[in-house]
């Protein structure tokens, strides 16, 4: 072919180009113009050539979709020949075949092997679970308890392996069941009133059941007919085989925090286990309350803190607490003490309590309470609310809608009156778990005991009228010394029946347990004779026309007369003699000036009172011969004024705590007195203001100067020094004016304690010493006796005023079992202060109790 020269290049068609190529390579053209297409490769640049070779072989995926099947094996780059075999290359080929979804879901994910040189990273991340990728199921962790129940010193409150039958119920479910039952009863009563045909029976329930069943059958037929015309579509969970409702996780053990387990004593461990069983409903599904009635000094506070901490942190469901919030209510003097106890036993940063101490304004307090009541879950930063009974009663309306996990009532005998405002207000709180702390659940009568039980577990003993009819009246008749033998048998039967019901929800231990952990305690009831001046004033008053009116039943102020007699027994300076006792001027001793006429001369004359003279001698001997400290307690602040004058006149440094002191300052005052480096010698304490819950272990001697009508108040006051932390032997003295109204009060206390020991302590051998008729003789003076109380005992160990047989076994609540010493035999008593009173006129008789 000859090309003609032209000025313009002619346009050549595509077909002509193809013919030209074929003509040049005619010898290489096959029979068919069909050859597998191969993508042209890009030109490798110089920079590309300088890069290092690939570490992993290249894989050819071209066999997918091939026809001739010549490319079944993987393509391996020549540059890495020898580094990977055909078998290894084939393993890298991806499989695009369709797989069964169930197989994909069930297949376990395997973590890729670590890169060479980075094995340490895999070791660091070994504790982490593999990442969730694609269709992998969620990792199900094995439920585990918060603390190891298999530890050597572990204290297990709930063990799923042994307590599996005792399933802890959910309070919400129990309440729902109660509501359903109540609604069912209401519906049945309504049907009965409307129908008025047949009495209520099982037939009514059967009819209602059949009606409901027929309605449900018709509804199911309608649903089935309509469902025939619908496509039976399945949900994604059904298609993937995912369960709609997972089975509940297995329960885990509940274990006391090891830091608390190390310090709990055996009786305290028993107490915590009892409390946990009660509040979790393992004793009775419908009763979640209980009473901790241990005597003072056994560690009720620590036991309740262990319970509270366990409920806030653990439950049989792993990772979930039993409760979110709790309230601690107590006397105002103990609010700060409870906060300190939480820090003492749990640690500084373990828990942050919400303390209502009166420092905030009313509006700020209301806002804080509303916020505390509304938060839930992780928003709860202050789970424990601590408030006094009065404060909680005032602001209870702002907590009515709050879900409170537990209510803990310290010194719970404040709830002894079910008609009081405090009882009514606290009973409105939305809380089922109620724990009452009271070392003296029976203070005056069984009605108060019923109030405490009814608050802890409402409805357990029926209504108050039912309790009084079924239990209180028969038991009191059986305890009366004038009762018949039949009354005693009936009372014992009712007492056993009541104890069977109540003992499931009350735990009571006596101070005898403390003998293992505390020093010896000597407790004495010291009967002191009146001075000549006191005796004349006492006789003058009980023979006055005012007392005669009271004895005839026409007097209008018997309580005032009782108060005047008690003040005469303490010291004449407590009275305004010219006004309170008309015509007593002739009885004044030579040189005596009444208190209201002395002016600034306020020095006290101890010789005018038998009890005050004994007190002055004791203080002097303690100060001169020992380094002990002493606590002086009285029911009257005016008596504390006399103590203060006496200490000031003798140069004794004294601290005073009464109802006038700010609550925030009380704990600082107690800490100052307990500090051994401080030089305070006497602590003056009002039993009304600080007789409950205050620890005065800095002193090892205590004098209760006058008795209270309520034996619980005296028992609380007497327990201030013999407590945990005490290092010295303790000496406790109770002063009683011989033959006076104070001895009548003491006898009445003995009767109440005898009743308490029968109901609470289950003591069967407490003798019926007193008749109720004898206890009404309050305005009589027996000035010819050394101890009227001892005469009522008919003690077989004493003859002619002397004890020939020492007490074989002393019961703390029964002074008839104590050692008895009259004044001539005081030289044989262990106490060196009382031993020196032998031969003197002031002390007539002493009852002695020794702890161990």
From Swiss-Prot:
Where the record annotates domain Helicase C-terminal, the positions are: 614-767
Q: What job does the chain carry out?
A: Plays an essential role in homologous recombination (HR) which is a major pathway for repairing DNA double-strand breaks (DSBs), single-stranded DNA (ssDNA) gaps, and stalled or collapsed replication forks. Acts as a molecular motor during the homology search and guides RAD51 ssDNA along a donor dsDNA thereby changing the homology search from the diffusion-based mechanism to a motor-guided mechanism. Plays also an essential role in RAD51-mediated synaptic complex formation which consists of three strands encased in a protein filament formed once homology is recognized.
Return the annotated region ranges for Disordered: 187-208
Supply the EC number(s): 3.6.4.12
Assembly information from the UniProt record: Homohexamer. Interacts with rhp51.
Q: Which CDD domains match?
A: DEXHc_RAD54A, SF2_C_SNF
Any one GO BP annotation for this protein: gene conversion at mating-type locus
Chain ranges of the Helicase ATP-binding domain:
281-459
Gene Ontology molecular function: ATP binding; ATP hydrolysis activity; DNA binding; DNA translocase activity; helicase activity; metal ion binding
Q: Give the binding site residues for ATP.
A: 294-301
Q: Which family does it belong to?
A: Belongs to the SNF2/RAD54 helicase family.
Supply the InterPro entries for this chain.
Helicase_ATP-bd, Helicase_C-like, P-loop_NTPase, Rad54_N, SNF2-like_sf, SNF2/RAD54-like_C, SNF2_N, SNF2_RAD54_helicase_repair
Q: What is this protein called?
A: DNA repair protein rhp54
This enzyme catalyses: ATP + H2O = ADP + phosphate + H(+)
Bias class Basic and acidic residues marks the residues at 187-205
Organism of origin: Schizosaccharomyces pombe (strain 972 / ATCC 24843)
Is-annotated flag, keyword Transcription regulation?
A: no
Q: Where is this motif: Nuclear localization signal?
A: 35-51, 178-181
Principal EC category: hydrolase
Q: Which UniProt keywords apply?
A: ATP-binding, DNA damage, DNA repair, DNA-binding, Helicase, Hydrolase, Metal-binding, Nucleotide-binding, Nucleus, Phosphoprotein, Zinc
Q: Which subcellular locations apply to this protein?
A: Nucleus
| Residues spanned by motif DEGH box | 410-413
What's one GO-annotated cellular component? site of double-strand break
